[in-house]
């Protein structure tokens, strides 16, 4: 009996240590490099996802300092930056500061479907089926974005038109769309880069063993919970997002993140 008690106590202690070390809410910046013959000078794109109006220090200082440290050429926001429950103040502060310092582009997610105008009021460019030719560091990009299908009944029509444009574009093509589960609909465009969010990293992770336990749309053991996926000729990157206090399920071994993509 004593041996069993010691064993159970040992198991409990190990589980407690495992959880404590995994309970990490320190903001990380995760970097990816994408090589392309279309690009001769590096272009740095910083991607924010799923902020859900969460707080990052006084005046969002922790988040804004991390963005500054990443030294992006442009900032993209791939949905659920606002929340449909938490008040908008933290997001308003974030967007206003970002737009003062970098070109910013925004697509809606399922929790901020009606917030495109609110983002635009801060100087952020909201994309709803739009294709924008950009020149960044003398490099030609075609930046495209889709509103969340919950908001946009024209989602399928917009996506078909954008896929057609991407197929013939000579510029480096980038698609912003909130939901990673729809990757099968995006791939016919032959995009060079697709950026999504929504999955919150699958909430619980075990690095090296489990990339995510549960995600919206995909359910248990989601295929596209977070990270980089090289699919055909497309680099698909899913941000694990920035949500903290807004989540019903705590994050485990899944710290909030910014995604920095350097195209070269």
Regions found by a protein language model. Give the residues of each.
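Core catalytic region of metal-dependent phosphoesterases/phosphodiesterases
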Residues: 59-135
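Active-site neighborhood of phospho(di)ester-bond hydrolases with catalytic His/Asp-centered motifs
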Residues: 47-49, 74-80, 104-110, 127-129, ...
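Binuclear metal-dependent hydrolase catalytic cores centered on His/Asp/Glu-rich metal-binding motifs
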Residues: 116, 121-123, 128-130, 136-177, ...
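Acidic/histidine-rich helix-loop elements
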Residues: 21, 45-61, 81-89, 114, ...
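N-terminal Sec-pathway targeting helices
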Residues: 1-13
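Conserved beta-sheet core of the metallophosphoesterase superfamily
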Residues: 180-259
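N-terminal active-site segment of His-dependent metallophosphoesterases
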Residues: 10-90
């Amino acid at each position: 009996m004593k041996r069993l008690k010691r064993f159970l106590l040992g198991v409990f202690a190990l589980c407690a240590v495992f959880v404590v070390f995994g309970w990490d809410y320190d903001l990380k910046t995760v970097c990816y490099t994408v090589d392309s013959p279309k690009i001769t000078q590096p272009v740095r794109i910083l991607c924010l996802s799923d902020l859900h109006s969460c707080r990052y220090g006084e005046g969002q200082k922790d988040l804004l300092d991390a963005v500054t440290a990443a030294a992006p050429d442009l900032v993209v926001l791939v949905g659920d930056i606002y929340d449909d429950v938490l008040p908008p103040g933290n997001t308003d502060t974030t967007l206003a500061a970002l737009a003062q310092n970098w070109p910013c582009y925004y697509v809606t997610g399922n929790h901020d479907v009606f917030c495109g105008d609110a983002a635009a009021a801060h100087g952020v460019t909201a994309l709803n089926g739009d294709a924008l030719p950009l020149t960044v560091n003398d490099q030609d990009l075609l930046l495209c974005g889709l509103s969340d299908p919950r908001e946009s009944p024209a989602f399928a029509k917009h996506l078909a038109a954008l896929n057609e444009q991407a197929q013939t574009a000579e510029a480096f093509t980038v698609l912003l769309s909130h939901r990673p589960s729809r990757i099968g609909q995006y791939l016919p465009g032959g995009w060079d880069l697709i950026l999504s969010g929504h999955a919150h990293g699958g909430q619980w992770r075990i690095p090296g063993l489990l990339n995510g336990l549960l995600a919206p749309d995909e359910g248990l053991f989601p295929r596209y919970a977070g990270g980089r996926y090289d699919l055909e000729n497309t680099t698909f990157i899913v941000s694990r997002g920035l949500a903290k206090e807004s989540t019903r399920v705590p994050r485990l071994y899944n710290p909030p993140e910014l995604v920095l993509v350097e195209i070269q």
